[in-house]
Regions:
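Short, intrinsically disordered, charge-balanced linker/junction segments flanking boundaries
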Residues: 27-31, 248-250
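N-terminal pre-domain segments of enzymes
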Residues: 32-77, 81
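Channel- or pocket-lining gating/hinge segments that regulate access to a cavity or pore
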Residues: 235, 241-244
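Bacterial N-terminal signal peptides
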Residues: 15-27
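Feature captures the catalytic cores and cofactor-binding loops of soluble hydro-lyases/lyases
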Residues: 71-75, 80-232, 245-250
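N-terminal secretory signal peptides that target proteins for export/translocation
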Residues: 1-11
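Buried hydrophobic positions in well-ordered alpha/beta secondary-structure cores of metabolic enzymes
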Residues: 56, 173, 234-236
Length: 250
């Protein structure tokens, strides 16, 4: 049986429903960006028993990263498959500044979603409270990078207006991490990036547009790219076939 409310009450019911959804959206945004704390990062990477960053992210030693530069996707796949990790490889990338040397690094993640005004307002408010007022949200995660990190961004495959970085932010990424960039989305200013010696980006596309209508909802949180689950502290290893994301304890 269908219920029918009096017409004069309908608008108030809609308002109440909207307010409830807004509250849920704000809480969801802060659950990832504001309160995904050190303890939660340790919990989701509990098999790692080595050194960790201040925020709880696993820190695989440099000597291990160096050895992984010679590992092929097939070799990594065999080990991962044997341990039950069947969804750690993602292919079909475009490479900006391709080179023979493979990118290997400790993953720092960023999660973006299509912009929603109510949630984005609260994210920007929190950013302002933290002093992040002079640059866009895409720069927030770049500020966290350390040498040996590799930034992995889920821009939900957005190409037009999904350009996470141009040559200026690419320079900032390389200056801080001495490493590259992986984006499930796009970049711009490729001609400028070609002048950054040692920098490389793996992207799903390129576009001249500026980043627009997206919001950052998580830094160093679990993300998904294609059929791959990626955690902060994983080790990203590139080769001509694509990118393998290796759990740190393996």
């Amino acid at each position: 049986m269908a219920f029918s409310f009096p017409r004069k009450h309908t608008s108030w019911i809609r308002v109440a429903a909207m307010l409830a959804l807004v509250g849920m959206g704000v809480q969801a945004g802060f659950a990832q960006l504001g309160t995904y704390d050190k303890e939660k990062r340790i919990a989701i990477t509990h098999k790692w028993t080595g050194e960790r960053a201040e925020d709880g992210r696993p820190l695989v030693p440099d000597e291990v990263l160096k050895r992984l530069k010679t590992a092929s996707a097939e070799e990594a796949w065999g080990v991962l498959r044997g341990e039950g990790y069947n969804y750690q490889f993602e292919g079909n990338w475009q490479v900006v500044n391709p080179g023979e040397e493979r990118l290997v690094g400790r993953v720092v993640t960023a999660q973006f979603m299509p912009v929603r005004p109510d949630v984005n307002e609260m994210i920007n408010k929190k950013g302002a409270e933290e002093g992040r007022v002079s640059r866009g949200q895409n720069s927030w995660v770049i500020d966290t990078l350390k040498p040996g990190d590799i930034l992995v961004v889920d821009m939900f495959g957005k190409i037009k207006d999904g350009t996470f970085a141009g040559d200026n932010l690419a320079t900032a990424i390389f200056t801080k991490s001495k490493n590259g960039l992986i984006v499930n989305g796009s970049v711009r200013d490729v001609s400028g990036m070609q002048g950054i010696k040692g920098f490389r980006a793996y992207v799903k596309g390129v576009d001249p547009s500026a980043i627009k209508d997206v919001m950052i909802v998580g830094i160093n949180v679990p993300i998904r790219i294609g059929e791959t689950t990626i955690l902060p502290g994983d080790v990203a290893v590139t080769d001509p076939e694509g990118i393998t994301f290796i759990p740190p304890h393996l």
